[in-house]
Amino acid sequence: MAEEQPQVELFVKAGSDGAKIGNCPFSQRLFMVLWLKGVTFNVTTVDTKRRTETVQKLCPGGQLPFLLYGTEVHTDTNKIEEFLEAVLCPPRYPKLAALNPESNTAGLDI
């Protein structure tokens, strides 16, 4: 029996027009993680000047981006990335972590 795809929705900062995807590097990073994992997901843009009641209920006062995974709300880009790496793991989804743990600290002394 085929495994069900998780329901994933990424809420990102809208651009200056209030509708299109904005230029937030944190939103782009999470978008790329989901895309590289091969997950089907929805992207919802949030106009920071006019947050909807639904967004306020999901993540009151929360920073963008945030992730809705099923019914769970996840905030903080680094924590979201760690969560996705933990739940969307091999063999179904590729591992995105570096092969050599030392590469995570490369360049820190510059």
From Swiss-Prot:
Q: Methyltransferase among the record's keywords?
A: no
Residues passing through the membrane, by range: 26-46
Q: What is the lineage of its organism?
A: Eukaryota, Metazoa, Chordata, Craniata, Vertebrata
- The enzyme's main class, written as a single word, is oxidoreductase
Q: Which UniProt keywords apply?
A: Acetylation, Cell membrane, Chloride, Chloride channel, Cytoplasm, Disulfide bond, Endoplasmic reticulum, Ion channel, Ion transport, Membrane, Nucleus, Oxidoreductase, Transmembrane, Transmembrane helix, Transport, Voltage-gated channel
Listed GO molecular functions?
Answer: chloride channel activity; oxidoreductase activity
The EC number on file is 1.8.-.-, 1.8.5.1
Q: Which InterPro entries match?
A: CLIC, CLIC_N, Thioredoxin-like_sf
Q: Which residues carry this modification: N-acetylalanine?
A: A2
Cellular compartments per GO CC: chloride channel complex; endoplasmic reticulum; nuclear membrane; plasma membrane
Ranges for region Required for insertion into the membrane? 2-90
Q: Which family does it belong to?
A: Belongs to the chloride channel CLIC family.
The cysteines joined by S-S bonds are C24-C59
Q: Which gene encodes it?
A: CLIC1
Protein's job: In the soluble state, catalyzes glutaredoxin-like thiol disulfide exchange reactions with reduced glutathione as electron donor. Reduces selenite and dehydroascorbate and may act as an antioxidant during oxidative stress response. Can insert into membranes and form voltage-dependent multi-ion conductive channels. Membrane insertion seems to be redox-regulated and may occur only under oxidizing conditions. Involved in regulation of the cell cycle.
On subunit structure and binding partners, the annotation says:
Monomer. Homodimer (in vitro). Interacts with TRAPPC2. Dimerization requires a conformation change that leads to the exposure of a large hydrophobic surface. In vivo, this may lead to membrane insertion.
What is the UniProt domain comment for this protein?
The active G-site contains a monothiol Cys-X-X-Ser motif which mediates glutathione-dependent redox catalysis.
Q: PTM N6-acetyllysine: list the residues.
A: K13
The cross-references to CDD domains, in alphabetical order and at most eight, read: GST_N_CLIC (cd03061)
Motif interval(s): G-site: 24-27
The protein's annotated catalytic reaction(s) are:
L-dehydroascorbate + 2 glutathione = glutathione disulfide + L-ascorbate; chloride(in) = chloride(out); iodide(out) = iodide(in); thiocyanate(in) = thiocyanate(out)
Instruction: Name it.
Output: Chloride intracellular channel protein 1
